[in-house]
Design a protein with these regions (language model features):
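Conserved beta-loop-beta/alpha segment of the NTase-like Rossmann-fold superfamily
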Residues: 1-35, 68-69, 78-79
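Catalytic-core segments of class I nucleotidyltransferases/pyrophosphorylases
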Residues: 9, 38-114, 119-136
Length: 136
């Protein structure tokens, strides 16, 4: 996470988001970046049509659950309208921050990341890790 924090500091970012590439973005916040890692679009739990517009190569960049944020985010949270199920999503607040021309960057995680957002995904991640260990 040192590289994530270093990027955040060097770019004088308002927000820096850890990203991961996946094939199915339907359960996640999805982003698109430019060549300088500046985020140019963010959407929470996109429809298939919305997601297709953000596809890169053979996958999608999703928010991997870690965001570095400055205190200014609280002003944007107050302006964020509730979305699906009347929830206020931090992703929508960060999108407002970005639309206000604040520096929002993404850092793509290299390596393995396990989604544990559902019980089934948690069990699968645990099984994979258990298989890696030698308990003899």
């Amino acid at each position: 996470m040192y590289k994530l924090l270093k990027m955040h500091t060097e770019k004088k970012a308002e927000s820096t988001i850890l990203l991961n590439k996946v094939k199915d973005p339907s359960r996640f916040g999805l982003v698109k970046m430019d060549n300088n890692n500046q985020i140019i679009s963010i959407i929470e739990k996109p429809s298939i049509k919305q997601a297709e517009n953000l596809k890169i190569n053979s996958g999608f960049l999703i928010i991997a659950g870690l965001l570095i944020l400055k205190n200014s985010i609280f002003d944007f949270i107050k302006k964020t309208k509730p979305g699906l199920n009347k929830e206020t999503w931090l992703t929508d607040s960060v999108e407002l921050l970005r639309q206000d021309k604040k520096n929002v960057f993404g850092y793509e995680l290299k390596g393995t990341r396990y989604d544990i957002g559902t019980f089934e995904a948690l069990k699968e991640a645990d099984r994979i890790e258990q298989d890696k260990k030698d308990f003899s």
